[in-house]
Amino acid sequence: MTDRYAVFGNPISHSKSPFIHGQFAAPTQESLTYEAILAPVDGFEASLTAFFNAGGKGANVTVPFKEQAFALCDSISPEAKLAGAVNTLSLLADGTIRGDNTDGLGLVADLIANLGSLQDQRVLLIGAGGAARGCILPLLNAGIAQLTISNRTHTKAQLLVDIFTSVDNGAYVSKVTAVEMSELAGEFDIIINSTSASLAGELPPLPAHIITTQTVCYDMMYGASVTAFNQWALSQGAAKVIDGLGMLVGQAAKSFTLWRGIEPDTQVVLTLLRDKLMAEPK
């Protein structure tokens, strides 16, 4: 019997998830289908319920439904709890729905694939939205030394720190701080841009001095060409820049493992996806 999976969003036609999961399944002989489902903005719950009632086993969730999906879960992972959102839903044997957030896990997996280790790294996280919130715990669990969060609106960055502090057991509280962009000082080993500014060709208002010849810069956005943030980072002398395509594949791989119990080969799929992206009409 073929198991059904899907990704829900609005819009959704641009989604690369069906291609990614199809590539994950092919070498494993896993019998499954994976489709993109356009859910009405006011009809996500009904669409999801219909999918599960028709035999769906699991689903990914993207904009704008991640918070709604969180509210529908019977159980959630620690990462999802802190993120306040889920991107992966699993229908369990007892009929309940488990929610996970694999976005931050995908980011960490891609960083480790590129850098080898995150142990004792000093990380600056730009942005304080859902993408940033979902990455805090995975980054800390990876062994980083400190996490500085900075956002155009400082109160949002501080709120993110406060939310984390309220749910943390005390092990990481001293490692997480919020700093205004204009007051950023010192050196960072890794700078992560979680904002969508690059999609509009824009940049967060960051001081150039925070980038050194040792700094690795990571933009969660991606495209056929170098993103605006990564172009700026290179112009300031960054040691290395990485875009978010590997994070996309990484979070999908974590979802696939949750559903199927198999760890897919992400590097092969990332290469295929990069080639596919480069071949798309500009």
Curated annotation (Swiss-Prot):
The catalysed reaction is:
shikimate + NADP(+) = 3-dehydroshikimate + NADPH + H(+)
* One Gene Ontology cellular component: cytosol
Q: Which InterPro entries match?
A: Aminoacid_DH-like_N_sf (IPR046346), NAD(P)-bd_dom_sf (IPR036291), SDH_C (IPR041121), Shikimate_DH (IPR011342), Shikimate_DH-bd_N (IPR013708), Shikimate_DH_fam (IPR022893), Shikm_DH/Glu-tRNA_Rdtase (IPR006151)
Record keywords: Amino-acid biosynthesis, Aromatic amino acid biosynthesis, NADP, Oxidoreductase
Q: Which residues form the active site?
A: K66
Residues reported in the UniProt entry to bind shikimate: S15, K16, S17, T62, N87, D103, Y222
Highest taxon of the lineage: Bacteria
Q: Name one GO molecular function term.
A: shikimate 3-dehydrogenase (NADP+) activity
**Which pathway does the UniProt entry assign to this protein?**
Metabolic intermediate biosynthesis; chorismate biosynthesis; chorismate from D-erythrose 4-phosphate and phosphoenolpyruvate: step 4/7
Question: What is an annotated GO biological process for this record, any one?
Answer: chorismate biosynthetic process
Annotated coiled-coil positions are none
Q: What is its EC number?
A: 1.1.1.25
The record's section on SUPFAM superfamilies has: Aminoacid dehydrogenase-like, N-terminal domain (SSF53223), NAD(P)-binding Rossmann-fold domains (SSF51735)
Q: Which residues bind NADP(+)?
A: G127, A128, G129, G130, A131, N151, R152, T153, H154, T155, K156, M220, G244
Per the entry, what this protein does is:
Involved in the biosynthesis of the chorismate, which leads to the biosynthesis of aromatic amino acids. Catalyzes the reversible NADPH linked reduction of 3-dehydroshikimate (DHSA) to yield shikimate (SA).
Family assignment?
Belongs to the shikimate dehydrogenase family.
Q: How does it assemble?
A: Homodimer.
This protein is called Shikimate dehydrogenase (NADP(+))
Q: What species was this sequence derived from?
A: Shewanella baltica (strain OS185)
